[in-house]
Amino acid sequence: KGEAPAKSSTHRHDEELGMASAETLTVFLKLLAAGFYGVSSFLIVVVNKSVLTNYRFPSSLCVGLGQMVATVAVLWVGKALRVVKFPDFDRNVPRKTFPLPLLYFGNQITGLFSTKKLNLPMFTVLRRFSILFTMFAEGVLLKKTFSWGIKMTVFAMIIGAFVAASSDLAFDLEGYVFILINDVLTAANGAYVKQKLDSKELGKYGLLYYNALFMILPTLAIAYITGDAQKAMDFEGWADTLFLLQFTLSCVMGFILMYATVLCTQYNSALTTTIVGCIKNILITYIGMVFGGDYIFTWTNFIGLNISIAGSLVYSYITFSEEQLSKQSEASNKLDNKGKGAV
């Protein structure tokens, strides 16, 4: 009888140790998923910019089409080799994926088009609006609330974007319109992916596969009707080995980025995924100023870019701190409840 409390306290101690090691592994996986997404999204912007601007490849649509085909091919082979698992097609699959294929298509094409039209610093600073739109989307779809600190840092980022845009000497209206549409679609896509992953019907691979598969024929039809397919076929750079390598990389990176986005959203949240994208954009902003070739320096623009960057850094810090605090309080509540149960 006297040994029972000692046993229960030892058991509780073991449980706490087990929970701590599981939490460490979870944090490591979260950081790994976030890092993988950051590197992937950095590489794809640089490669897409090179293909569309430096090589003047005439069709954003055909780059998008290449990315869809690569995604379907890689996942199909992966499933055949039993490396990945996802459900076979049935008549319920379109209902389970909707509206993600449309958001995916819109997101991809507007992103590529704005990459072509805007210099990298303005492209990245205008992408900050996706955080504002993600907050709206998560509020409406996932019923999330945000602290005063988060709202203020998002406000700082948006003000910085407005200041930078006010003296953008390379202003391109089409580019601005497409990047803002892209921001809205990114936000909606992130929130819907989280919702669909939580329902566990198709899984991350199923979502990736069917998103791309359902949009290949519509994209091909649009490319044919608009004359983009012909422009791509007439392009003179196909004989250039370096261009071919970058075009192939752009197609494969499209799949890797989609996978990294879903992985980061699954292990973290849609908001964390957007933050990581934002930090990556800081690197791209400064690299784009020096190496992009299409950035025109003005002090107002430069100050605006840096206000936005400072806002995104503070924002990232607050969000991660809040996430860790909420997880710690959840863990301590669980332990308290277990302790009460043991007593």
Curated annotation (Swiss-Prot):
Origin superkingdom: Eukaryota
UniProt keyword Membrane present: yes
GO molecular function terms attached to this record: antiporter activity; UDP-glucuronate transmembrane transporter activity; UDP-N-acetylgalactosamine transmembrane transporter activity; UDP-N-acetylglucosamine transmembrane transporter activity
Extracellular side stretches: 48-56, 166-172, 226-241, 292-302
Record keywords, A-Z: Membrane, Transmembrane, Transmembrane helix
Broad class of where this protein is predominantly found: membrane
GO biological process: nucleotide-sugar transmembrane transport
Membrane spanning residue stretches: 27-47, 57-77, 145-165, 173-193, 205-225, 242-262, 269-291, 303-323
One cellular component (GO) term of this entry: membrane
InterPro entries, per database record: Sugar_P_trans_dom, TPT_transporter
Membrane-protein topology: Multi-pass membrane protein
Family membership: Belongs to the TPT transporter family. SLC35D subfamily.
Name the UniProt record assigns to this protein: Solute carrier family 35 member D2-like protein
